[in-house]
Amino acid sequence: MRKMVNIGFIKMGNLGMSQVINLIQDEIAAREGITVRVFGTGAKMGPADAADTESFKQWNADFVVMISPNAAAPGPTAAREIWKDVPCIVVSDGPTKKEAREALEQEGFGYIILPVDPLIGAKREFLDPVEMASFNSDAMKVLSSCGVVRLIQEELDRVTEQVASGKSGEDLELPHIFAKPEKCVEHAGFANPYAKAKALAALHMAEKVAQVNFPACFMLKEVEQVCLTAAAGHEIMGAAAILATQAREIEKSNDTVFRQPHAKNGTLLKKVKLYEKPE
């Protein structure tokens, strides 16, 4: 008999991917064999917020997915110390350096590092709730259409299947993935090469956003410089979302959108033509 799998999600702060990561394994709320619970700390991700996640251990997750910006920051680092005795997959936009990623693996953590999940222009002079929501909407358009969502979903399903089959703890094989644009787009299932090229361009643009917004967030002081730079970063993200939409529209016009829904038992089904049944 297959085991019921408890999957915990710890959300500290916010990435674009944070919006849907706990939903992508059960997209129509009909999957059997998994139970999902989420512990979130809102927009903040400090050490005190990390300490609060310990109460989530009472739920006894088989593995947890810890998503936050900058996994090397003090808060996420403190959270990993709390959760080091539970199989844990870190999903973050950094660290991007090989040595830091290898350190995560040596400490027993899985990871999916997403340099394509963009840094928002988080300065009071520029960002209000509407701008924040709009930016995250643009980010999700790229993450969903260009392969990032499917990459993460497939990796989480792979670990889930191991638990369902009886593996646990240190026996689980966790992912160790640095999800550069070229890797992400291969998971999108594009049939048309021009659609794929547009999606790859969108991913490269999303990766560039952090380079533009970082000075606005942490270095620049003059209001005009802060606002101009952050606005430029957000314009890049908006343009990337348009490219991602165009890529999917090409596939729709050819009736070649690749879909991969879950069966009730969690098996991945496939379909391409709109009127086909998934098999």
Curated annotation (Swiss-Prot):
SUPFAM superfamilies: F420-dependent methylenetetrahydromethanopterin dehydrogenase (MTD) (SSF102324)
UniProt keyword Transmembrane helix present: no
Biological pathway: One-carbon metabolism; methanogenesis from CO(2); 5,10-methylene-5,6,7,8-tetrahydromethanopterin from 5,10-methenyl-5,6,7,8-tetrahydromethanopterin (coenzyme F420 route): step 1/1
Reaction(s) catalysed (UniProt annotation): 5,10-methylenetetrahydromethanopterin + oxidized coenzyme F420-(gamma-L-Glu)(n) + 2 H(+) = 5,10-methenyl-5,6,7,8-tetrahydromethanopterin + reduced coenzyme F420-(gamma-L-Glu)(n)
UniProt KW Oxidoreductase keyword: yes
Transmembrane segments: none
Enzyme class: oxidoreductase
GO MF annotations, alphabetized: ferredoxin hydrogenase activity; methylenetetrahydromethanopterin dehydrogenase activity
GO biological process: methanogenesis, from carbon dioxide; one-carbon metabolic process
Top-rank taxon, per record: Archaea
Keyword terms: Methanogenesis, One-carbon metabolism, Oxidoreductase
Listed EC numbers: 1.5.98.1
Similarity annotation: Belongs to the MTD family.
Xref: NCBIfam families: PRK00994.1 (NF002162)
Biological role stated in the UniProt entry: Catalyzes the reversible reduction of methenyl-H(4)MPT(+) to methylene-H(4)MPT.
Identification of the protein by name: F420-dependent methylenetetrahydromethanopterin dehydrogenase
Organism in which the protein naturally occurs: Methanosarcina acetivorans (strain ATCC 35395 / DSM 2834 / JCM 12185 / C2A)
Higher taxonomy: Archaea, Methanobacteriati, Methanobacteriota, Stenosarchaea group, Methanomicrobia
